[in-house]
Regions:
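N-terminal ligand-binding lobe of clamshell/alpha-beta domains
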Residues: 1-162
Length: 162
């Protein structure tokens, strides 16, 4: 589930959106595929969908996985129970809308959705891409910031991205 907005109203993005394309390209299934783009939803709908993974947008800078983990309304959602809520990375640009960094987003998402199938060195790919795209060689701390390592700490599979 790509959570397009958390506050003031919950919103998700369904089929026909770049967010749906991203999920499918990474080998996932968008539980919100039946709705349109940026549709207002409620917690009951999220409960009915029972997503295994929740992706948090970058359009709300203060939105973190911890907010969902601490929100009692989300307590019974499988993604929350199993610590599979992820803040999408943001580097030279946000990774959730289509951009020159989208291939990195697809790699990141595939690593998290299918840890048993993929094992590429994402941090190296980020450094290489930023060198090519921006003429910038990020150090380990800069890559941690791109990947929101602190915000995603404790999420399943995130240790492999450190």
């Amino acid at each position: 589930l790509y959570l397009a907005r958390y506050a003031p109203q919950l919103r998700a993005s369904g089929a026909g959106t770049s967010f749906d394309d991203d999920i499918r390209l990474a080998g996932g299934r968008n539980v919100a595929a039946a709705i349109g783009s940026g549709q207002t939803i409620n917690i009951e709908q999220i409960m009915a969908w029972a997503p295994d993974v929740i992706l948090l947008n970058n359009f709300e800078p203060g939105l973190t996985p911890a907010m969902l983990y601490q929100d009692p309304l989300f307590a019974d959602i499988p993604a929350v129970r199993h610590h599979r809520v992820y803040k999408i990375p943001a580097g030279g640009y946000l990774w959730d809308p289509p951009s020159q960094e989208s291939p990195l987003y697809w790699q990141w998402l595939a690593l998290l959705l299918h840890p048993d199938r993929f094992d590429w060195p994402l941090r190296e790919h980020i450094a290489q891409a930023y060198g090519q795209l921006y003429g910038y060689q990020p150090d380990a701390r800069a890559i941690d910031a791109v990947l929101h390592v602190d915000q995603n700490h404790g999420a399943v599979g995130y240790d492999r991205l450190r």
